[in-house]
């Protein structure tokens, strides 16, 4: 008689996705980040749920309700620290996951990749509205600056901004709706994650060589279930270490000052995981141009499958494109650094050069090098 997990309508789905799933035998630790992102998402939803039980989305009490959570609620400080730092780990895993996809050509699974880009945008939106909720100085001014960018939209810009604000400035209506969005978006992310998963399992996983691996598959359990478990332990170890020993390392000190519309902080900057996009936004001296560049910096990922020119899938056997990939990684790091710096010489020039290089790599250099490598292969 067949096992229950193979016959039960619900368990069969779990079995086909997590137990008897045929996986390439040679996928490396870079393939762990999908499950780590799942862990981050579950952690964020659970800690967020407990925070929402004590938080009040009102300008008069939001800041003090967060202080109350940290001081008076049982383990409230821990829940808040894990939620705040969990967001950073979410983005670390996200960037590594995207980097893996770019390096090994996983973007050629177009549906999976495009849903992934939409997920990336949604996670960014969720993190942005979440950062506004403690109603500190950086929360308020970050919300003001970023929502104000929508005023650059021709004709409807000003109306759009006031519609999002729910008034003539960032105020109580804005905070309340941002809390509603912050609660809603993670569940949309869960739904899209299921779709992401579904499309991935239509094709099966890619592998480091980029070669079809149908001839060499192993069951997901026990091989990759234990491998993923090891990744989960490392992630939880790193997250708990940061949350216990240095919970405010990645935060902004200005956010410990209650929001004051009359006093602007000396440097308005978002959390570290948005700095590369913020640097691209600031590198263009025109408002609409900056907004378009900001959008393009993320949406350019959707063009990657179209711009793939190489006959090989991944970069494992393509040293020239490998070099460009690592230049791209360094460029994103430089943009992240510039995004956190004041707008003055020499940071302006460095930011502009790095922004131009970012788009040039994606649109010109990497596709051209792929074509060149094809030619070199033909010569042999």
Swiss-Prot record:
Membrane topology: Multi-pass membrane protein
Sorted UniProt keywords: Electron transport, Heme, Iron, Membrane, Metal-binding, Mitochondrion, Mitochondrion inner membrane, Respiratory chain, Transmembrane, Transmembrane helix, Transport, Ubiquinone
GO cellular component: mitochondrial inner membrane; respiratory chain complex III
Main location: mitochondrion
Binding-site residues for heme b b566, renumbered to this chain: 97, 196
Description of how the protein assembles with itself and partners: The cytochrome bc1 complex contains 3 respiratory subunits (MT-CYB, CYC1 and UQCRFS1), 2 core proteins (UQCRC1 and UQCRC2) and probably 6 low-molecular weight proteins.
Other comment: Heme 1 (or BL or b562) is low-potential and absorbs at about 562 nm, and heme 2 (or BH or b566) is high-potential and absorbs at about 566 nm.
Protein name: Cytochrome b
Organism for this UniProt entry: Zenopsis nebulosa (Mirror dory)
């Amino acid at each position: 008689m067949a096992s229950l997990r193979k016959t039960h309508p619900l368990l069969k789905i779990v079995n086909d996705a997590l137990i008897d799933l045929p996986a390439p035998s040679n996928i490396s630790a870079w393939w762990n980040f999908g499950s780590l992102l799942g862990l981050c998402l579950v952690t964020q939803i659970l800690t967020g749920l407990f925070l929402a039980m004590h938080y009040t989305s009102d300008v008069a009490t939001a800041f003090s309700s967060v202080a109350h959570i940290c001081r008076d609620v049982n383990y409230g400080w821990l829940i808040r620290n894990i939620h705040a730092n969990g967001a950073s780990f979410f983005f670390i895993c996200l960037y590594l996951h995207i980097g893996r996809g770019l390096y090994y050509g996983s973007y050629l699974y177009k549906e999976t990749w495009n849903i992934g880009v939409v997920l990336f945008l949604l996670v960014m939106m969720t993190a942005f509205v979440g950062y506004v909720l403690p109603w500190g100085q950086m929360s308020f001014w970050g919300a003001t600056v970023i929502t104000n960018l929508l005023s650059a939209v021709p004709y409807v810009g000003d109306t759009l901004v006031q519609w999002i604000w729910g008034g003539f400035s960032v105020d109580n209506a804005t905070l309340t709706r941002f809390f509603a969005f912050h609660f809603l978006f993670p569940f949309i992310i869960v739904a899209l994650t299921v779709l992401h998963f579904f499309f991935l399992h239509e094709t099966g996983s890619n592998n480091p060589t980029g070669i079809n691996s149908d001839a060499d598959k192993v069951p997901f359990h026990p091989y990759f279930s234990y491998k993923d478990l090891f990744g989960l332990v490392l992630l939880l170890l790193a997250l708990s270490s940061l949350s216990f020993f240095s919970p405010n390392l990645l935060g902004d000190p200005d956010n410990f000052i209650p929001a004051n519309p009359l006093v602007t902080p000396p440097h308005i900057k978002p959390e570290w995981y948005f700095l590369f996009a913020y640097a691209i936004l600031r590198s263009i001296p025109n408002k609409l141009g900056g907004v378009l560049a900001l959008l393009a910096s993320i949406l350019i990922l959707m063009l990657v499958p179209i711009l793939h020119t190489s006959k090989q899938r991944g970069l494992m056997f393509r040293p020239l494109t490998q070099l460009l990939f690592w230049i791209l990684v360094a460029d994103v790091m430089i943009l992240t650094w510039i995004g956190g710096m004041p707008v003055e010489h020499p940071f302006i020039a460095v930011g502009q050069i790095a922004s131009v290089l970012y788009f040039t790599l994606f649109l010109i250099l990497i596709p051209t090098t792929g074509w060149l490598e094809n030619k070199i292969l033909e010569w042999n």
